[in-house]
């Protein structure tokens, strides 16, 4: 083990998914802690001996290897290394997440570091913490990028296609409503010929008119969504938040090739990956202190740009090997570290009950939900259920 007295200094930074996997001795796949009958750790669970080391000095899980002479041997039967039990104070595990999750520290707080980082340089590209929260919790969609050149080039052709489709829908609506009206008149004539009462005729006409109104409204709604989607698509820009799910589906189905986006932490991860931090830092510096002849920013926007520059510059810091000191992508978790079991112990009380650390309950909840999500994804469940 490392001696605490050997350190001159310590630096705290963001841990990347690869770093967490490197620290880890294995993936924790099951939420179980110990078997309450044998009182031994469950395999692949939160106290697994294969991952964290043996509970008894110089003894593997199955008991095949005992004593110090087998030091360093990994049992071929149970996979546990024969070593001291104190390694359970230092060996870590990890949980592979089925879907990425945003670290709450960087979303909420006195400042939302994610909101400052992901905000664009134009006023319309401003992103607030509450908006990001909606994206993260699957209540809104985020436009990550737009192929503006291709859209501009194809816009006349797309508009012509839209006009043709709109005309076709209107013609279909008129035909359908005329057909229903004719069917109603024929039915009423037959009822009258068969001696139907005035009350019956009136009731049938009222029901039919209700159906006609509903059908007309359905067509109007379809045309309205089409018009709204087209207007939205023409002015679509990166970092735009769209809360209307029906409108987003229409945009994605029709013109999904022209833009990228989505909801959840995945969308934020895509946006972070698109940021060129070197270019962004230069742009922000020129915005804060513009060259002579250029219009300066307002006081409020200048203050915001200064705060954003601090974050971008901090993420742009490099070590002696040219690697980033802190990776911004690490604010979004793909892997959760599991601390050593002896730092979150289970203690047996009188009467056979156990006292356990709150961390074990937290890990158990994360693993249960993660496994449930993995099963849904493996089954190919619809997106609306997964989200």
Label every PLM stretch briefly.
Residues 1-387:
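Extended, highly charged clamp/arch subdomains and adjacent linkers
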């Amino acid at each position: 083990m490392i001696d605490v007295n050997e350190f001159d200094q310590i630096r705290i930074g963001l841990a990347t998914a690869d770093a967490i996997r490197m620290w880890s001795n294995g993936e924790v796949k099951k939420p179980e802690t110990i078997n309450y009958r044998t009182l031994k750790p469950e395999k692949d669970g939160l106290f697994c001996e294969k991952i964290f080391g043996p509970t008894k000095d110089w003894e593997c899980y199955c008991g095949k290897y005992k004593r110090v002479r087998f030091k360093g041997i990994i049992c071929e039967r149970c996979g546990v290394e024969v070593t001291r039990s104190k390694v359970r104070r230092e060996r870590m595990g990890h949980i592979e997440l089925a879907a990425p999750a945003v670290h709450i520290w960087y979303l909420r707080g006195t400042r939302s570091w994610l909101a400052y980082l992901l905000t664009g340089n134009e006023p319309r590209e401003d992103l607030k913490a509450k908006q990001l929260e909606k994206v993260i919790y699957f209540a809104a969609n985020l436009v990550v990028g737009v192929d503006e050149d291709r859209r501009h080039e194809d816009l006349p052709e797309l508009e012509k296609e839209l006009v043709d489709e709109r005309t076709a829908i209107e013609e279909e609506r008129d035909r359908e409503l005329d057909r229903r009206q004719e069917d109603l008149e024929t039915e009423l004539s037959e009822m009258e010929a068969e001696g139907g009462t005035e009350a019956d005729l009136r009731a049938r006409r009222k029901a039919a008119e209700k159906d006609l109104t509903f059908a007309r409204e359905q067509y109007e709604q379809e045309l309205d969504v089409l018009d709204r989607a087209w207007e939205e698509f023409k002015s679509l820009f990166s970092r735009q938040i769209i809360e209307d799910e029906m409108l987003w589906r229409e945009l994605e189905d029709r013109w999904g090739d022209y833009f990228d986006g989505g909801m959840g932490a995945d969308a934020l991860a895509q946006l972070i990956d698109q940021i060129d931090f070197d270019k962004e830092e230069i742009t922000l510096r020129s915005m804060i202190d513009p060259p002579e002849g250029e219009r300066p920013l307002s006081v409020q926007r200048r203050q915001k740009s200064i705060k954003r520059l601090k974050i971008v510059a901090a993420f742009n810091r490099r070590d002696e090997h040219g690697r980033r000191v802190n990776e911004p992508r690490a604010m979004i978790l793909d892997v959760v570290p599991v601390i050593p079991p002896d730092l979150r112990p289970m203690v047996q009380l009188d009467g056979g009950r156990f006292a356990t650390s709150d961390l074990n309950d937290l890990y158990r909840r994360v693993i249960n939900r993660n496994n449930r999500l993995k099963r849904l994804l493996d089954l190919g469940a619809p997106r609306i259920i997964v989200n």
